[in-house]
Amino acid sequence: MAERANLVFHNKEIDGTGMKRLISRLIDHFGMGYTSHILDQLKTLGFYQATTTSISLGIEDLLTIPSKGWLVQDAEQQSFLLEKHYYYGAVHAVEKLRQSVEIWYATSEYLKQEMNSNFRITDPSNPVYLMSFSGARGNASQVHQLVGMRGLMSDPQGQMIDLPIQSNLREGLSLTEYIISCYGARKGVVDTAVRTADAGYLTRRLVEVVQHIIVRRRDCGTIRGISVSPQNGMTEKLFVQTLIGRVLADDIYIGSRCIAARNQDIGIGLVNRFITAFRAQPFRAQPIYIRTPFTCRSTSWICQLCYGRSPTHSDLVELGEAVGIIAGQSIGEPGTQLTLRTFHTGGVFTGGTADLVRSPSNGKIQFNENLVHPTRTRHGQPAFLCYIDLHVTIQSQDILYSVNIPSKSLILVQNDQYVKSEQVIAEIRAGTSTLHFKERVQKHIYSESDGEMHWSTDVYHAPEYQYGNLRRLPKTSHLWILSVSMCRSSIASFSLHKDQDQMNTYGKKDREILDYSTSDRIMSNGHWNLIYPSIFQDNSDLLAKKRRNRFVIPLQYHQEQEKELISCFGISIEIPFMGVLRRNTIFAYFDDPRYRKDKKGSGIVKFRYRTLEEEYRTRAEDSEEEYETLEHEYRTREDEYETLEESKYGILEDEYEYETLENEYGSPENKYGNPENEYRTLEKDSEEEYGNPESKYRTQEDEYGTLEEDSEDEYGSPGESGEEKYGTLEEDSEEDSEDEYESPEEDSILKKEGLIEHRGTKEFSLKYQKEVDRFFFILQELHILPRSSSLKILDNSIIGVDTQLTKNTRSGLGGLVRVKRKKSHTELKIFSGDIHFPEEADKILGGCLIPPERQKKDSKESKKKKNWVYVQRKKILKSKEKYFVSVRPTVAYEMDEGRNLATLFPQDLLQEENNLQIRLVNFIYHENSKLTQRIYHTNSQFVRTCLVVNWEQEEKEKAGASLVEVRANDLIRDFLRIELVKSTISYTRKRYDRTSGGPTPHNRLDRANSNSFYSKAKIESLSQHQEAIGTLLNRNKEYQSLMILSASNCSRIGLFKNSKHPNAIKEWNPRIPILEIFGPLGAIVASISHFSSSYYLLTHNKILLKKYLFVDNLKQTFQVLQELKYSLIDENKRISNFDSNIMLDPFLLNCHFVHHDSWEETLAIIHLGQFICENVCLFKSHIKKSGQIFSVNMDSFVIRAAKPYLATTGATVNGHYGEILYKGDRLVTFIYEKSRSSDITQGLPKVEQIFEARSIDSLSPNLERRIEDWNERIPRILGVPWGFLIGAELTIAQSRISLVNKIQKVYRSQGVQIHNRHIEIIIRQVTSKVRVSEDGMSNVFSPGELIGLLRAERAGRALDESIYYRAILLGITRASLNTQSFISEASFQETARVLAKAALRGRIDWLKGLKENVVLGGIIPVGTGFQKFVHRSPQDKNLYFEIKKKNLFASEMRDFLFLHTELVSSDSDVTNNFYET
């Protein structure tokens, strides 16, 4: 007894690990037999103790924790607050998810802690408490689920379901909770069965790969090894684990003393000696080389020494042991366990790992604010991040506490703030532990309501890919979805409400006008054009919202020749979709109302080219002879033209039937105008017809240019050689285009006359540009009638106007009728004009035009003509001699050349000298002498004037102009943004004389020799300023505000930047030219009070502000202008009011201030277009809804409801600015990092992916690079045979080690210990194959064949020729199907295919593995059956020495190959270094 009393008595609980340690100590001390006896006694003791106390377990024993109710309530309150923050746009979706997970996780954890103390205090003998907390059965987490709350679940993908299960199993779950609980990954019903099957299948494949690996001999004689050294950042524990049970590949010396010999197995004693040696001399210690299954030289088995000790006892593994199957089972079995273990919440949060710093007492906190900078926490709350260790002092009443906060921590309080005791003041970032995988996850945010997307200026306007609609966010900003209620209507509906009226929900929204009744039409087909008919004057914003791809420049167009002022017409600017304008691109056009055909009907356009020589002549020299050029010239030209037309312009022959057109363009009226059943005559007094913008005829918007233009580009101008003046092609030319009309339907031909559709950007060459200075329109009618229709008139008869032609067709013109019958239809042409039968008809020139005031000698006419006439010679009924002449009235249109840009644009528009010019080009729409068909009684446009962007030829740099659309306050604004890439221009500054009307601000530049849009003289590259300048219009009738979005380093509004001294301004002459003050604004014309919308073309430097002036009398205008108030909003959102009226002289377009002081600055609380979040306290009452300020009045403002979404940097925005989105459309895609749980939801699939050699994440790129370098360098150094061998070996060695490490990482993170050598055996099989490459043809293997690396080496040595091959990584499935035994392959998968292939190849199975023998019923070659298979040959003993002799130069090579120790990436646990002969 005395002895026992002296023994140490351990009174503490013992758990599994303690038990393990105890047993291993016992084995070391007493050996196996005695230990088993001791353990038996322990078991008996345990049983005895367990049965003496009887434990029952009933449902009453599950006691719910009393504090659960208020804890859950508290968490719900926090979630509600979070939801509100999200709604206000204060946190974004990812932060919301993270925080909600953490709130519930914390609640759940707190409950778990409460549970323990609750049991201990209230019922210490509770059986549940006794069982679980003694560690006998169950664990705290399970009991927590029974009596606490189940908490958060992961879905099968390992993502969090952010709806927590609040009930526990004692209370029972609600239906939703039950489904989540099944779905969640904690022993989920859904998922366990599948996972178990997966784990089982993994085990089966692993065993299949390595079933034939048996320990067959003692030593394979290899002299390779893998180096292990604790210097490579290995923990001591890992180092010990790696070494114990291995065999040394080389002697180990400390100093000159050898402490361990080659082929000695390493026990715990030896390892301890290594460690002490390393500690004593950490730098001088050499790495230890050990043998592993990787280094074994045998092909299909393994030797004792390379395998090392058996896992079951501390001695070398026995011969005949089936180590392959043991390895497969050891790896697969934890997988099965892993699937079924409960694991925690899928690891979305890392909240558990962050340590909190709490305040030691109440007091005032102070720290150095220069050492921190503001940031957002993971939950979107403001915090400070400290770069370096920070000392924080807390001043309480009597004591000064100092708290040290480590670097990279977040400080959650402000400087000088009062903190309470135990308040969290900082959060320490947890050191990133290696066990946490980080993964990047995408999260999509979807719109919660219909609306219009709006983003701040922080979004790049150019999308990421040229034609995509994805944009990256450069910094954190809000996206707003402005609420929209859609009124879908094919045309602009006539609205009962004016702009900015408030509407009741059930108010009458708008009365739609039927499609065919109104004469105002919006052209559809992707471009909205703006037309201002009279009824829309007050609410033109209806139209404004619809314009998508085009904007209109209002032009002030005075035509002095005409008596009355033609009202302005808009230039339509084509905005290529996301496009950039290139040189010589048409970027705008307008249809001059003077060149418009009346509604009277179809006809022919005739014109001629002016050749270049003629341009130098004056018009006065045009003599009469030039009119009468010879007929054969026309003929040749016509032939040329016909061939041209037939061969090339097949497009023209498109038959457009009614239906196809409808499908393509909506309704045909939308494109061509609409039916109008009156004909207007063409008289001089119908000027208003031309000037009226409502009667526009547009052909399809995508077409640029005309046929003529194209033909000139591609084939040279057909009329290049001719000098002919007025005249046409040969007389019957319009009847030659026979088969253009195929449609049998009456009146439904919609033929695109003389237009080629050209979808791309039209560029034209300057080479062949000809000019036409006059063209003529000859009326002529064409009816295409179905074959069946009965005609009421005869061919060649003469009819009057409105004669009935068929049952329901009447003629629009009077004149000669020609009828042609075709296969499918009948063509009926009516030529207007008089018919004459002259005597000498053959002498008359066919098809010539006669100017007014002259008479044709051959014709009997002697009347004076007002207009030009067109004489055509026709044959009578095929007879050769008889001709008659038809004299047809024409309308002549002069092309006026004098009009250039100066009259169209104010001088300061688009004038960026030396860089950009805009040329004016007129296009004639119709082909010469082609019939223009009247379509649905519309008027057609003959000439379209195009503006062409043109850069100076000499400039080498590319310049690009693109159009940006920005929308604010419900107005679309498109800006022409001209980016001059890499053109650095220097600026000079010149002081002006003071005499020129007051002082000029300092920043005025000399416009003669520099570009005119910089406020400071400096050398600067223009490519920095790629921002648009815009205007923000207020539709309030009294004043409008202008907002300039300019690059911050570009010029702001002149004086904002330069005048830092307000006194300096007062000394100036009060008449300051407004042009200078406005800087980039340029001239301003104010909006007319009753007309509310205006459009501006804005360049990078100038803004043109012009209006449609619908006011006839200018006095009224003048009065209106005097009442205007102006205010400017600059980029910093300051509003500047000019406190004076501005006198505007609309003729001179220059503005002056008429007041003593230039401006006053008022800092407004709100401004137009500003976005306001809900509950912002601007006024006494809170704002009830988030939205955009829509209009500001004296005492109130209107908000358009909007919903903000916060988006972080790097998020991708889907959709375009101003796009209408519907509920559920994707708005933003976040990319965020979350720590990935390495548990089985992701762990097992990950292990499987590695074994199957599918890439899970890219290899460390430096590893790939190093291997490539090696593969390049080594052949150079060593010559080819060595090079390939070593290159392939290196690749294989590297990949093997990194694979082992990856697999170990997953298992260790789960707390599962698997010995490296099991994994090594499997990886060895997966990586031991090489593929023969085609470089060198060898006689042994065919290219592409998979062979073992060792076999390839041996074959190469035997044949003395180099075999070219590259290393390949097979998955376990493919490795199982690429073994030496076809029987084992066939019993695994694809039986028929494998057997058929084996039969064709005549494969032999040597029955070396276990499976083949099992299948065929033989004795398996392991254990006792092993002896029969192995006959020891006497040479085995001498093998080692022979190898020594062979490898004479091993030592020299070894030094050189030592270099690649560093080749292994630093994260690998084991580094390898092998050397080879």
UniProtKB/Swiss-Prot annotation:
Family recorded in the similarity comment: Belongs to the RNA polymerase beta' chain family. RpoC2 subfamily.
Gene Ontology molecular function: DNA binding; DNA-directed RNA polymerase activity; zinc ion binding
Cofactor note: Binds 1 Zn(2+) ion per subunit.
Binding positions for Zn(2+) per the UniProt entry: 220, 296, 303, 306
One GO term of the biological process aspect: DNA-templated transcription
Renumbered residue ranges of the record's region Disordered: 617-754
Catalysed reactions, as listed in the record: RNA(n) + a ribonucleoside 5'-triphosphate = RNA(n+1) + diphosphate
First-level EC class: transferase
SUPFAM superfamilies to which the protein is assigned, alphabetical: beta and beta-prime subunits of DNA dependent RNA-polymerase
Record-given protein name: DNA-directed RNA polymerase subunit beta''
Residue ranges with Basic and acidic residues bias: 629-638
CC cofactor: Zn(2+)
rRNA processing is among the record's keywords: no
Function: DNA-dependent RNA polymerase catalyzes the transcription of DNA into RNA using the four ribonucleoside triphosphates as substrates.
Entry keyword Zinc-finger: no
